Amino acid sequence: MSGHSKWATTKHKKAILDSRRAKSFAKLIKNIEVAARMGGPDLAGNPSLELAVTKAKKTSVPADNIDRAIKRGAGLTGEVVDYTEIMYECRGPQGSALLIECLTDNKNRAASEVRLAISRNGGTIADPGSVSYLFSRKGVVTLPKNGLSEDDVLMAVLDAGAEEVKDNGETFEIHSDPKDLQAVRDALKDAGIDYDTDEAEFVPSMEVPLDLDAAKKFMKLVDALEELDDVQNVYSNADLSDEVQAALEAE
């Protein structure tokens, strides 16, 4: 799940099951294949591929798997890689909104599985454009505080195109135009600042607070969507307060 409110930390603290880890690897490999197909196998000349590979390495995808995915995507193995990107829009509990980003080799399968997961878990498929206008595409870098202040981070990345630095409690989140993501990453490296994640994401313009009951339903919906092989990312404008997070973690 990709999100920009503090509720995301709740999911990060859950135990990672082997099945989830395998699904995560498969999705990262798919991203590499698509990036290599679109821009070629050279990381230096293909920023999208470089980002996909960096993310895979941070998630401990084996180097051999990454290398094979690059070659497969670039057509160097004779295999055909043909994925289609699809975005579904969904209304969740208590006025929350979700964008579901899919990467699939079978559009009919993806549509059927996404719709079923939504309908079975209290969501409603929304018309195209009725949810997406609530989000904008941003480059997002998340980093641990490690004793840094918000000003420390902002000064390091301001000239690289950073638009804002958000304080998420345990972490900072840097927003930029997606085209400036590489420059922001480089600026952090030059300043000796470590970061956890970096990618282009859909960021909500406003967040919607959920109470405990709605949060439970929301998490169930997100879990069902993330279990689907064709779903690459789920973005939302849901916000969970510290109290709601604590109640979820206590269950």
Swiss-Prot record:
Its main subcellular localisation, reduced to a broad class, is: cytoplasm
Task: Give the species.
Answer: Arthrobacter sp. (strain FB24)
This chain belongs to the protein called Probable transcriptional regulatory protein Arth_2304
Q: Does ATP-binding appear among the keywords?
A: no
Which terms does the record give in the GO molecular function aspect? DNA binding
Highest rank taxon of the organism = Bacteria
What family is reported?
Answer: Belongs to the TACO1 family.
The UniProt record lists the keyword Transcription: yes
Matching InterPro entries: Integrase-like_N, TACO1_YebC-like_2nd/3rd_dom, TACO1_YebC_N, Transcrip_reg_TACO1-like, Transcrip_reg_TACO1-like_dom3, YebC-like
> What keywords appear on the UniProt entry?
Cytoplasm, DNA-binding, Transcription, Transcription regulation
- A single GO cellular-component term on record: cytosol
Q: From the Swiss-Prot or TrEMBL record, state where the protein is found.
A: Cytoplasm
BP GO annotations: regulation of DNA-templated transcription
